[in-house]
Amino acid sequence: MRVGPLHGWSERFAALPDGVQIVAEPFVAMSDVRIDPAESGPLAAHLGVALPTTPNTWVQGDTTTVIWLGPDEWLVTSPFTTPEELESGLRAAVGGAGAVVDVSAQRTTLSLRGEHVRDVLATGCSLDLHPRVFGAGSAAQTTLGLAGVVLLALDGTGTHYEVLVRSSFARYLATWLLDAASE
């Protein structure tokens, strides 16, 4: 049986105060893609969505999320497929024009929702998370607590975020979030 880094934490998350909900989403398939954006047409066709080229943004395809990490680097995630299927499909689309690496085991995903979740994040993140600045479609590689994360804004109201944290830091970050939410 596969066990994610936050296996057994659902009861702790369920005990959070009203206004903050955290759900661990383990085993999301993730691949890092490096390609010149000018050569990304076949990849975009495969994904069903153009790669975001505006820094610190993400886009949603039918079954994948594509996160801008750099001028020629994206993180492609999908909870709907296996890491092997995601990587092989991306490799076929990229061909010799770029590189694809499976990084699924590197990170785990946390979904954070609620009217106070932005306040919780703000206690440990130096970014301005107000929806006018960090609204739906925004993404950033940043620090939350002392953990490096990829942070996605999933709505325009500041009440739904996704946090991708290195698996080895997942328990630290979960403990930090529980503490920050109880303040």
Residue locations for each model-derived region?
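Basic, glycine/lysine-rich polyanion-binding surfaces/domains
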Residues: 1-183
